[in-house]
Amino acid sequence: AELRLSGGFPGTIALVTFEHGQLASYEFHDIYDLQQAYQAGRTQPITPPYPVAHHFGHEELPIQDATWETDFAAGAARLVEMYRATGWPAINGVVAVTPAVVSDILGLTGPVTVEVDGEPRRIDADNVHDEIERQRYVHGGDETAPSHKAVLALVGRVLIERLSTADRALLLDLIRTMRTAADERDLQVY
């Protein structure tokens, strides 16, 4: 995993829309799709912090490193600012979750089976992180291959559908789990 000051590398993003307190729509995207839109739409490049320039060789700040801040709110604010240049639908905030949160949710809902690289894969609380890393190994840096974190999007879709029909007891457990995740900074909101 690639660590960042305010968490990990944001490989998968989701655009989530709520209307009248209800989930209206969601779309998952690879961070590099957002980076391409940002590069096409930005008018002025942002100089990256020294570590990003020095260690990653970037002459300008890529959107995936916008959160290179020790203060999550400052990094999220920069991300929102950069996001505006993409031409994508407007956003009102940023929610960051680590794979640990996905694991915790799978612990509540039970395993899911999704098709990864053309084969069904059973993903559960114990193997979700390993599956993400397996995808990194399988694709071995191939920039034309789907993101190794695409598995999060596949699992995320199933979890959203399950949670949208969950009973009250499961939703209460989810709230408790999210509270713990927020306390541990595995879930951050801006």
Residue ranges and their predicted role:
Residues 1-190:
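Non-catalytic, solvent-exposed segments at the cell envelope interface
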